[in-house]
Design a protein with these regions (language model features):
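Electropositive, beta-rich accessory/interaction domains or terminal extensions
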Residues: 1-170
């Protein structure tokens, strides 16, 4: 018998995970609000529109990610009631109404200040085709902690379980 110990989802693609008590699964989409948002990485408006309209063409390099910008690991996002909250050390440093263009622009400028080597940052949203660019289909991710513990033993060092996930296709 398997037991799920913790539930996480990521409102912003490749930047953070939020712990929640329950998740809603949407048929043919995945976890509600999971990776609905992404910050683009030095893309012009034409390229942004192209990847929004062609989900299979999305690549991790087009988005801000911890893989390429580990300095963002200090930050986290929560999404609730149309507000995207940027947090550092569990403290909200900016709360953005995603329906307010001015507030979204302020958030993008804040993110750009955190990663000055990136010239242009835009927040994009797609709730029908979330930003699952690393998988060919819509997925739900699970972590088997015993597998990670075995991996730690083989490596002889601690491994952050948040970096791994198994995938279930829906």
């Amino acid at each position: 018998m398997f037991r799920i110990n913790k539930l996480f989802y990521s409102p912003v693609k490749s930047l953070s995970f939020s712990s929640v008590k329950k998740l809603k699964i949407l048929n043919n989409i995945g976890i509600k609000f999971d990776r609905n948002f992404a910050f683009t990485r030095d893309l012009d408006d034409n390229k942004i529109n192209y990847i929004l309209n062609n989900p299979l063409e999305r690549q991790i390099i087009n988005f801000l990610s911890l893989k390429h910008l580990p300095e963002l690991n200090k930050y986290n996002f929560d999404f609730e009631n149309n507000f995207l909250k940027l947090k550092k050390n569990n403290n909200i440093i900016l709360c953005t109404n995603i329906n307010n263009k001015l507030e979204v622009e302020i958030l993008c400028k804040k993110i750009q200040k955190l990663v000055p080597k990136i010239n242009r940052v835009k927040l994009i949203q797609d709730s029908i085709n979330p930003f699952f660019d690393t998988m060919p289909s819509k997925t739900i991710s699970l972590i088997n902690l015993n597998s990670i513990r075995d991996f730690e033993i083989k490596l002889s060092q601690k491994v952050e379980f948040e970096r791994f996930r198994g995938n279930i296709y829906i």
